Amino acid sequence: MSITEHKYNLADSDILTDVFLNIKMMIWRPEARAVVIGNSNKAVNTVDIPNAEKDGVSVYKRNSGGESVVLTENMLIISIAKNIEKFGNSKEMFNQYNNLIIEGLSKLGIKNLGLKGISDIAIGEKKILGSAMYRNKDRSFYHAVLNVSEDIDIITRYLRHPEREPDYRSGRSHKEFVTSISKEHKKFEFNEIKTILENVFSEHFGKEIEISEN
C-alpha cells in the first residue's frame, strides 16, 4: 500500500529563500493535520497509511533528516533559518536553539525540562519537542514541533513505530514516550507561548534576528 508523498510546501517552506540579514525565525500553528516524513523516510515504512487516507491527512517529505512527525493545530512549529559561511557542529546548534526554547518554557513555569537524544526536549523522560535540521550551501534551517495540547492518540493513529529511535525512548510506544505541555502542566494560550519564545530569541540574538509576522 502506498500514499502520495508531497513535496514539503507548508507555511515555513519559503524561509530558505527569503531575504534577511542573518537569522529569521517563524513560529506558526498548522491549519490542518499532516504527516511530515524525514528525507530518508518512506511513508510505507513510517506512516499508518490506511488511517491517513481515511482521514484525508496529507503526507509531506521534508529536506531535513530525522523521523516522521504529525503536525496538528494543537502544536506549534518553530522554524529558524540562518545565513552561514561555514556550517559548524549541528549538535551545538540544536543545543543552542533548544536551550533557548527551554528558557522560554521555564519562564512560563514549566518544570523538569531537559535536552534528550540528539535534538529533543522532554519533560522528565517524555518528549514534548522534536527537531530536525537541513542546510544548503548558504543557510541552515532548523525546525521543531512542540506538542502544546495534542492527544497522543492522534500521533499513534498516523505514525508507525519509528525505524530509528533515541536511546532514552527504550522501545516505548508513542503513547508511553510522547506527552504534551497541557497534560504535564496546564493549558496555555498559543500566543502566550509564541510570544515568550520570540522574546527569548530576540533578547539572545538582538539585531541579528528577524521575527516573521505570520
Task: Annotate the PLM regions.
Residues 22-23, 64, 116, 141:
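Short beta-strand-initiation
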